[in-house]
Structures are given as structure tokens and as C-alpha cells.
A protein has these predicted regions:
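Short, charged/polar surface micro-motifs in flexible loops or helix N-caps
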Residues: 25-31, 39-40, 91, 101-106
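Charge-dense, intrinsically disordered terminal/linker segments
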Residues: 1-16, 27-28, 154
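A generic fold-level signal
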Residues: 15-17, 26, 41-42, 92-93, ...
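Unchanged
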Residues: 53-79, 85-139
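Conserved Nudix-box catalytic region and its N-terminal flanking loop in Nudix hydrolases
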Residues: 30-67
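Conserved N-terminal beta-strand and adjoining loop/helix that marks the start
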Residues: 12-32, 53-55, 85
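Short secondary-structure boundary/capping segments
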Residues: 14, 23, 39, 46, ...
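Charged phosphate-binding loop/patch that engages nucleotide di/tri-phosphates or the phosphate backbone
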Residues: 140-154
Length: 154
């Protein structure tokens, strides 16, 4: 975890955008995925994990991931229930992946509170094998396997 006193310098020094995503795994070992809405400029109709950009107002990567899960899916997670999985270095961003098996609330896809745009228009709980079959998925299977291994070892 990056502590609050170093947080703003971390965000400012790093020229890449910081993104955090959460892999929610239910009791049947199914993973929550969200379909990006048709209004998405880059990946309309693609399936992805809940997540998004870290804001300077977020206290940590975990706090940003938890906020994004609440904004995008209506689920609440305690930062203590998040387990770090990996960091993916993308061309213009660093994507930090967390996994959890504990959350509260019911799925409620709602517009982004800042833009009032519906970012996702559908959700489903799937196995890794089912994700492989999706033609429009941007979720790497090796990350999902790594996340499932993490929760098995807890």
C-alpha cells in the first residue's frame, strides 16, 4: 500500500494513468464481469472487470478500486477484504488488479456520478472457461487464474 503522505507525489510523478480493477469471485467460483455500454468510445460491447482511473482524492489504490466497484456495480467492499493480484503495465496506463470474495449490496449498474454516462449496460457471473469463449473480452485469463490461486491460498 502506498501511504497517504506519498500518494500525490506517486500520482504526479507517474506519467501513466493509474487504473485499478477488482475481480469479484462468488461462492461458486464465478467472476463478475461487466459489459461496456454502446456509448463507450473505445471498447463498446466488450466485457471487462469493474474498475477505472484512480483519482487524486482516493487515499490508495485499494480505495480507488473500492470506489470504482461501488460506482460501476453498486457493490461495497472493505479495503481490508481486497487482495493484491498483479500490476499490468499497459501502453498509457498501469492497471492494478485486486481480488475479493467479500462485498455487500446488490448489483446496480448506474451512470458515472461525474459524467452521468452509463458505462456498463449488463453484467454476468462467469467461469474462466466461459470468459475464454467470449469474443469480446479484454480480460486476460492468466490474471484470472492468478486471482483464483490467491484466494485458494488465503
Amino acid at each position: 500500500m502506498i501511504y497517504k503522505k506519498h500518494w500525490n507525489s506517486f500520482l504526479n510523478e507517474n506519467k501513466k494513468k493509474e487504473i485499478a480493477s477488482i475481480i469479484c469471485v462468488n461462492d461458486e467460483q464465478r467472476i463478475l464481469i461487466l459489459r461496456r455500454s454502446k456509448t463507450d468510445k473505445h471498447k463498446a460491447d466488450f466485457w471487462d472487470l469493474p474498475g477505472g482511473h484512480i483519482d487524486p482524492s482516493d487515499d490508495s489504490l485499494e480505495a480507488g478500486a473500492a470506489r470504482e466497484l461501488q460506482e460501476e456495480a453498486g457493490l461495497n467492499v472493505s479495503m481490508g477484504d481486497l487482495t493484491y493480484v498483479t500490476k499490468r503495465e499497459l501502453h498509457k496506463a498501469n492497471r492494478y488488479i485486486f481480488v475479493t470474495t467479500k462485498w455487500t449490496g446488490d448489483i446496480n449498474l448506474k451512470p458515472n456520478p461525474k459524467t452521468d454516462i452509463l458505462e456498463h449496460d449488463d453484467h454476468k457471473w462467469v467461469t474462466i472457461e466461459e470468459i475464454k469463449e467470449l469474443e469480446q473480452s479484454i480480460i486476460p485469463n492468466y490474471i484470472l487464474r492468478k486471482a483464483l490461486d490467491k484466494i485458494k491460498n488465503e
